[in-house]
């Protein structure tokens, strides 16, 4: 995964196989520095003071605090079952962490590094993005919650109000949507883009090479109306 820091002047890349966070040159051509961790890096964010916060994989996941310039580790704490994403929010002045196998969103005070709030969200939250002037978080959950006998069967996205600390709404992706990987929001906070699969579970199991069973998809969410807009099939 790629992450920007220092107002877009610094580029970081996660190397999951090597359990590393790598700082690249601004043009992305050279490796300037790398930090090694005990488990694969899932995500990072930067707070208002320039510190970097990194969450790493594992049943007993870890959150690291790094000096923004030297990239030296300042502290580390245990942080739930597989913290999958982390985001600093300037309105709440806190860190928000999706806890994949806790099915929760945690708010953490960066000064004390203690959990302030736990919010129940969908099944296996894996990614998030801020919108509406940083007042809301869009949480992308990995799997559908409903039983396999239900209709439709699809992943739902959670919208969390940062100040009230409550789920303010949900958006369901098209029938068959599963295995969500990431979510991103445009600079105007008008649309969100979600990458996932659409499972063709109502079709016979043939022509697998044509994506008949699992098709890579990009779904677009209208953040003003707070509803699903359309989906683009990426496989041919």
Feature roles, as predicted:
Residues 167-176, 226-236:
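Surface-exposed loop and turn segments in beta-propeller and other repeat-based domains
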Residues 25-29, 67-71, 109-113, 161-165, ...:
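Short loop/turn segments that connect beta-strands within beta-propeller blades
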Residues 5-8, 46-49, 89-92, 131-134, ...:
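Residue-level detector of Asp-centered blade-edge/turn motifs that repeat once per structural unit
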Residues 1-20, 42-43:
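Beta-strand-rich domains and repeat architectures in extracellular enzymes and scaffolds
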Residues 140-154, 194-215:
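Short, conserved, GDST-rich strand-edge loop motifs in beta-rich repeat architectures
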Residues 17, 58, 101, 143, ...:
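Residue-level signature of beta-propeller blades and closely related beta-rich strand-turn architectures
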Residues 10-12, 51-54, 94-96, 137-138, ...:
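Conserved beta-propeller blade signature
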């Amino acid at each position: 995964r790629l992450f920007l820091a220092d107002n877009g002047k610094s580029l970081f890349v996660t190397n999951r196989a090597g359990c590393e966070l790598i700082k690249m040159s601004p043009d992305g051509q050279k490796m300037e520095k790398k930090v090694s961790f005990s488990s694969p890096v899932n995500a990072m964010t930067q707070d208002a003071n320039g510190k970097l916060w990194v969450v790493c994989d594992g049943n007993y996941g870890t959150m690291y605090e790094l000096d923004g310039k030297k990239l030296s580790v300042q502290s580390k704490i245990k942080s739930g079952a597989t913290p999958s994403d982390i985001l600093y929010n300037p309105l709440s002045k806190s860190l928000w962490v999706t806890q994949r196998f806790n099915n929760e969103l945690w708010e953490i005070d960066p000064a004390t590094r203690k959990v302030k709030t736990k919010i129940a969200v969908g099944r296996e939250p894996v990614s998030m993005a801020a919108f509406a002037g940083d007042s809301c978080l869009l949480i992308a959950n990995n799997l559908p919650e409903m039983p396999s006998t239900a209709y439709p069967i699809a992943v739902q996205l959670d919208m969390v109000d940062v100040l009230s600390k409550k789920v303010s709404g949900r958006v369901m992706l098209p029938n068959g949507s599963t295995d969500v990987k990431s979510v991103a929001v445009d600079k105007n906070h008008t649309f969100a883009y979600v990458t996932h699969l659409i499972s063709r579970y109502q079709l016979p199991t043939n022509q697998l090479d044509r994506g008949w069973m699992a098709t890579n998809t990009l779904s677009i969410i209208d953040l003003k109306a707070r509803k699903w807009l359309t989906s683009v099939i990426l496989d041919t």
